[in-house]
Amino acid sequence: MSKIFVNPSAIRAGLADLEMAEETVDLINKNIEDNQAHLQGEPIEVDNLPEDMSRLHLDDGKSSDLGKMSKAGEGKHQEDFQMDEGEDPSLLFQHYLDNVGVQIVRQMRSGERFLKIWSQTVEEIISYVTVNFPNPSGRSSEDKSTQTTSREPKKETTSTPSQRESQSSKSRTAAQTASGPPSFEWSATNEEDDLSVEAEIAHQIAESFSKKYKFPSRSSGIFSYNFEQLKMNLDDIVKEAKNVPGVTRLAHDESKLPLRCVLGWVALANSKKFQLLVEANKLNKIMQDDLNRYESC
């Protein structure tokens, strides 16, 4: 019978991906809990209010009819409050964000990658804000004063098809501006290329996570350092590594990466201990030599 051998490095890389996914899910759940913190307080009971709360009512010269007015208008005030709560755009937006967070968690549990989910979510949120929170700059002071005295049905919700089309185009432009250069489009091919590059970088770093690399020290000697000593998440290390010149292209071609150069780059930017130990001038020369050697292969 033939036996199937599993590469230990593949197992370590898979465990690292699972750890990153769990940390991302925990972070999203924490953000959802923080956003819903205002819903966890104890409700205020009207029966527990002080008896002299009636003093807060405005006296319009007809104090004798205050009791009748309060009883007769009690139902109307409750109805107005319920309408305000239902029509409050900020409250509706809060519910929308809660649902978006739950949807992100469900998609990640189903196996989808976070970067793809987030790029789609950004466009949806921008479209929601553009449609439901129009720019009020065109309103005059007279319209604002009229709005405070009398309530009129909202007309912003009904828009013509041309307005909807212009709003959707604005949302797409805003999403592209927030995501990167205008020429970059969030196509499936670009996302897959970017994810494959990150996966290749993460795979090679995970394989050599505990391997010691030699660096020049300030005391004219050498010292050993590895990725474990960074005390950083693998996802954060990959993001820093993508800034090293030439690493993204090498990862796209599935070529071997200059891991000592990557480690020196990340450690020099994030580790104070490494900064105190290393000789910066010699490190720059070593990193440049490593890049030239790997790019020429």
From Swiss-Prot:
<comment type="similarity">
    <text>Belongs to the lyssavirus protein P family.</text>
</comment>
<dbReference type="GO" id="GO:0044423">
    <property type="term" value="C:virion component"/>
</dbReference>
<keyword id="KW-0945">Host-virus interaction</keyword>
<feature type="modified residue" description="Phosphoserine; by host PKC">
    <location>
        <position position="210"/>
    </location>
</feature>
<feature type="short sequence motif" description="Nuclear export signal">
    <location>
        <begin position="49"/>
        <end position="58"/>
    </location>
</feature>
<keyword id="KW-1035">Host cytoplasm</keyword>
<keyword id="KW-0143">Chaperone</keyword>
<dbReference type="GO" id="GO:0043657">
    <property type="term" value="C:host cell"/>
</dbReference>
<keyword id="KW-1048">Host nucleus</keyword>
<feature type="region of interest" description="Disordered">
    <location>
        <begin position="132"/>
        <end position="189"/>
    </location>
</feature>
<dbReference type="GO" id="GO:0039563">
    <property type="term" value="P:symbiont-mediated suppression of host JAK-STAT cascade via inhibition of STAT1 activity"/>
</dbReference>
<keyword id="KW-0899">Viral immunoevasion</keyword>
<keyword id="KW-1106">Inhibition of host STAT2 by virus</keyword>
<protein>
    <recommendedName>
        <fullName>Phosphoprotein</fullName>
    </recommendedName>
</protein>
<dbReference type="GO" id="GO:0039564">
    <property type="term" value="P:symbiont-mediated suppression of host JAK-STAT cascade via inhibition of STAT2 activity"/>
</dbReference>
<keyword id="KW-1225">Inhibition of host TLR pathway by virus</keyword>
<dbReference type="InterPro" id="IPR037199">
    <property type="entry name" value="PP_M1_C"/>
</dbReference>
<feature type="modified residue" description="Phosphoserine; by host">
    <location>
        <position position="64"/>
    </location>
</feature>
<feature type="modified residue" description="Phosphoserine; by host PKC">
    <location>
        <position position="271"/>
    </location>
</feature>
<feature type="region of interest" description="Disordered">
    <location>
        <begin position="58"/>
        <end position="82"/>
    </location>
</feature>
<feature type="short sequence motif" description="Nuclear localization signal">
    <location>
        <begin position="211"/>
        <end position="214"/>
    </location>
</feature>
<feature type="compositionally biased region" description="Basic and acidic residues">
    <location>
        <begin position="140"/>
        <end position="157"/>
    </location>
</feature>
<dbReference type="GO" id="GO:0019083">
    <property type="term" value="P:viral transcription"/>
</dbReference>
<keyword id="KW-0922">Interferon antiviral system evasion</keyword>
<keyword id="KW-1223">Inhibition of host TBK1 by virus</keyword>
<keyword id="KW-1160">Virus entry into host cell</keyword>
<keyword id="KW-0946">Virion</keyword>
<keyword id="KW-1176">Cytoplasmic inwards viral transport</keyword>
<keyword id="KW-1105">Inhibition of host STAT1 by virus</keyword>
<keyword id="KW-1177">Microtubular inwards viral transport</keyword>
<feature type="compositionally biased region" description="Basic and acidic residues">
    <location>
        <begin position="71"/>
        <end position="80"/>
    </location>
</feature>
<dbReference type="GO" id="GO:0042025">
    <property type="term" value="C:host cell nucleus"/>
</dbReference>
<comment type="function">
    <text>Non catalytic polymerase cofactor and regulatory protein that plays a role in viral transcription and replication. Stabilizes the RNA polymerase L to the N-RNA template and binds the soluble protein N, preventing it from encapsidating non-genomic RNA. Also inhibits host IFN-alpha and IFN-beta signaling by binding and retaining phosphorylated STAT1 in the cytoplasm or by inhibiting the DNA binding of STAT1 in the nucleus. Might be involved, through interaction with host dynein, in intracellular microtubule-dependent virus transport of incoming virus from the synapse toward the cell body.</text>
</comment>
<keyword id="KW-0693">Viral RNA replication</keyword>
<dbReference type="GO" id="GO:0003968">
    <property type="term" value="F:RNA-directed RNA polymerase activity"/>
</dbReference>
<dbReference type="GO" id="GO:0039502">
    <property type="term" value="P:symbiont-mediated suppression of host type I interferon-mediated signaling pathway"/>
</dbReference>
<keyword id="KW-0597">Phosphoprotein</keyword>
<dbReference type="GO" id="GO:0075521">
    <property type="term" value="P:microtubule-dependent intracellular transport of viral material towards nucleus"/>
</dbReference>
<keyword id="KW-1114">Inhibition of host interferon signaling pathway by virus</keyword>
<keyword id="KW-1090">Inhibition of host innate immune response by virus</keyword>
<dbReference type="GO" id="GO:0039722">
    <property type="term" value="P:symbiont-mediated suppression of host toll-like receptor signaling pathway"/>
</dbReference>
<dbReference type="InterPro" id="IPR049506">
    <property type="entry name" value="RABV_P-like_C"/>
</dbReference>
